[in-house]
Structure formats: structure tokens, C-alpha cells
């Protein structure tokens, strides 16, 4: 029963409240921080559950009062309160069910975002740049940091490929739904006849992983160094500071040339490689677990066409949830929270459905 689980969580929360106030436990800072985090994680659920119990109690009391009340005005007032309390009870039930969903262990992590121009040549590269700008501006609104890992520009200012890191609490929880193929429909600046072209760009969002989560043996990698290049391939560095790492067992290749130091580029490239290997392992694991129950909201299939950006109509359509927004300019300017929140809600609804009957 869900109520039994909530009672267990509340008791656990009370135990932790006592422990984190214990001076003997506070002396062990690592243990104390761990308990504080566990306490904070449970606090939201416990607060909602305690409010739920109070609402149920008040609802019962008002119904009892109503059954013995003959005064018309008092009955009207009690009926209003019962309606409000019933609505709040339903809201809290949904809220608690969502809070009890299994938490993605990567949700609080920083992310690596990889954007590559796909079908459409130069126009696809320009669209890749548009997406990069959209995500970096969104990161600014969230007060997240952005750090470019590698960049391959075209002569017209588009991006053949860009890999960058977004640092901030909850970055993966919001951006993980962006992985997939993004399609743009617009008239290119170079198109004299005014025909609408369709181009694509691929986005991959990878959680940053700790060294302890993924180990890469020296024998499994080949490291090449070369000179960094800028627009159109011209050399921008006189030393071999750029680094390319090839993971021999999988064939994955990562390049980094953003730093002037070869050592720093190697460290950055290795971070990206570990995140790619982690994502690959997680994807294979998830496919094994959910082979026959594909989730409505994908968070990892790079070949899945997830969204269309239609310039003539000023619209964005997410094909996974069928949501269309008519605010293309502000969306590409970083105003993407409405879409992200809709994807999170759809994902939560799908998970609740898979959990089966969770009535309180």
C-alpha cells in the first residue's frame, strides 16, 4: 500500500532529523553530509504527506459537521470547504505519486551537449549554430555555466560539430529530453528562388560521470595530437595542443582543441569520452530492461526525430508529445521551459502508468 510506504518514509525522516542533530555524528563530516542529503531528499515528500493527512482529517471533520447541520448558510459554507479540500486532496495525491517515482540518479549532474549538423550541408551547420545559441541562452536563464570543449566551424559561421559542457544543479534533469534529431524548415539566405529547405541537426545530451563510475584503461585508447584549427581549417596555434582520443574497443573518437594546453585538452577529451561510454552502457542496459515497452518520451535515441522548427509558420512541434508552440523567435532565444516542463510531465505520466495502480 502507498500509505504504508509513506508512513515508512515519514518515520525514516524523523530518525534522520534526530541523527543530523547528534553532535557525535556531526564530528564525522562525510557521514553527516550524507545523512543531511538523505534528509533533504525526503523532506519534500514528507511535507506533502503531512499536508495530505491534515486535508483528509479536515475533510472528514467537515463532512461530519455537514451531516448534523441544518442552518442553510452554514451548510453552504461547509460544502464550499469540502469542495476546496477535495480538490486539494486530489492535487496532493498526484503530487505525492510523482514524488515517489524512481529518481534518475543522473538528474543533478552537469551535462555534455554534442550538436552536429546533419542532412542539409551548410544550412544544417547554421541550424546547429542556432541550437547551440538556444541552449547557451537557456543556460544563462538558469544561471548555469557553459564551457566549450571542441568546435568545428564553417566559413559562413555554422557549426559542423560543437561539444560543450553545461554546469549547474539539475542540468541533466531538464536537458536529457533534447537528445535526438532536430529538423528545421526554412528558406536559406543563399536561396534565390525562395524555396523552403529541410535540414537536420543531431543533439546528444550526456551526463558528466565521475572517474569511479567509468574506468578507461590506457591500453584501450590511442591519443593523437595535432594543431588546432579555426574557421575554414586555418591553423590558429603553432604548437600541437589539440588532442584526439580514440577508444579502441568501441571506435568512439573525441577531439578537444579549445585550450592552449595539450594536457587540459586531454583532460577535457577524456571527460567527454567517459560520458559517452557511460551513456552507451546505460542505453544498452535500458534497452535490455524495456525491450517491449518503449516509453512515449525518449531521452536517448539519437536517431529519433523529436522536433520540427518551422520558420514560415513560426512554430515548434515536438513529435513525441504532439505539442506545438507558436513562438519560434523566443524559443530559439532560450525560452524553452514550457516545452521542457511538458516533456517532464509526459514522462512522469508514462512512468506512473507503468507503475500500475498507485491509488492512496
Curated annotation (Swiss-Prot):
Name of the protein this chain belongs to: Peptide chain release factor 1
Single annotated GO MF: translation release factor activity, codon specific
Species: Clostridium beijerinckii (strain ATCC 51743 / NCIMB 8052) (Clostridium acetobutylicum)
A single Gene Ontology CC term: cytoplasm
Disulfide bridge partners, by residue number: none
InterPro entries: PCRF, Pep_chain_release_fac_I, Pep_chain_release_fac_I_sf, Prokaryotic/Mito_RF, RF-1
Modification after translation, per record: Methylated by PrmC. Methylation increases the termination efficiency of RF1.
Residues recorded with modification N5-methylglutamine: 234
Gene name as annotated: prfA
Region (Disordered): 285-305
Subcellular location: Cytoplasm
Keywords: Cytoplasm, Methylation, Protein biosynthesis
Phosphoprotein recorded as keyword: no
Role, per record: Peptide chain release factor 1 directs the termination of translation in response to the peptide chain termination codons UAG and UAA.
Secretion signal, residue range per the UniProt entry: none
UniProt cross-references to Pfam families, sorted A to Z: PCRF, RF-1
The organism's taxonomic lineage, starting at the top: Bacteria, Bacillati, Bacillota, Clostridia, Eubacteriales
Family: Belongs to the prokaryotic/mitochondrial release factor family.
Amino acid at each position: 500500500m502507498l500509505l504504508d510506504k509513506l508512513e515508512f518514509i515519514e518515520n525514516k525522516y524523523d530518525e534522520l532529523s534526530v541523527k543530523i542533530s547528534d553532535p557525535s555524528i556531526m564530528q564525522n563530516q562525510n557521514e553527516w553530509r550524507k545523512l543531511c542529503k538523505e534528509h533533504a531528499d525526503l523532506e519534500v515528500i514528507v511535507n506533502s504527506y503531512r499536508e495530505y493527512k491534515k486535508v483528509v482529517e479536515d475533510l472528514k471533520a467537515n463532512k461530519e459537521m455537514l451531516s448534523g447541520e441544518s442552518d442553510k448558510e452554514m451548510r453552504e459554507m461547509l460544502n464550499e470547504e469540502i469542495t476546496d479540500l477535495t480538490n486539494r486532496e486530489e492535487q496532493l495525491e498526484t503530487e505525492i505519486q510523482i514524488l515517489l517515482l524512481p529518481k534518475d540518479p543522473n538528474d543533478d549532474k552537469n551535462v555534455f551537449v554534442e550538436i552536429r549538423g546533419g542532412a542539409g550541408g551548410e544550412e544544417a551547420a547554421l541550424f546547429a549554430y542556432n541550437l547551440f545559441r538556444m541552449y547557451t541562452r537557456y543556460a544563462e536563464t538558469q544561471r548555469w555555466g557553459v564551457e566549450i570543449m571542441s568546435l568545428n566551424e564553417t566559413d559562413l559561421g555554422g557549426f559542423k560539430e560543437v561539444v560543450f559542457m553545461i554546469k549547474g544543479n539539475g542540468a541533466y534533469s531538464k536537458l536529457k529530453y533534447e537528445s535526438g534529431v532536430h529538423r528545421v524548415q526554412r528558406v536559406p539566405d543563399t536561396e534565390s528562388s525562395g524555396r523552403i529547405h529541410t535540414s537536420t541537426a543531431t543533439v546528444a545530451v550526456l551526463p558528466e560521470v565521475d572517474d569511479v563510475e567509468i574506468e578507461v584503461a590506457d591500453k584501450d585508447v590511442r591519443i593523437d595530437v595535432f594543431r588546432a584549427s579555426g574557421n575554414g581549417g586555418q591553423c590558429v596555434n603553432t604548437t600541437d595542443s589539440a588532442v584526439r582520443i580514440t577508444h579502441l574497443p568501441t571506435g568512439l573518437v573525441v577531439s578537444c582543441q579549445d585550450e592552449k594546453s595539450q594536457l587540459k585538452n586531454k583532460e577535457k577529451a577524456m571527460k567527454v569520452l567517459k560520458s559517452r561510454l557511460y551513456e552507451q552502457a546505460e542505453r544498452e542496459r535500458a534497452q535490455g530492461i524495456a525491450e517491449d515497452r518503449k516509453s512515449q518520451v525518449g531521452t536517448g535515441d539519437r536517431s529519433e526525430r523529436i522536433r520540427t522548427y518551422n520558420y514560415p509558420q513560426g512554430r515548434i512541434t515536438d513529435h513525441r508529445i504532439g505539442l506545438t508552440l507558436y513562438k519560434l523567435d523566443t524559443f530559439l532565444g532560450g525560452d524553452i521551459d514550457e516545452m521542457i516542463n511538458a516533456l517532464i510531465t509526459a514522462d512522469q505520466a508514462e512512468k506512473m502508468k507503468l507503475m500500475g495502480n498507485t491509488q492512496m
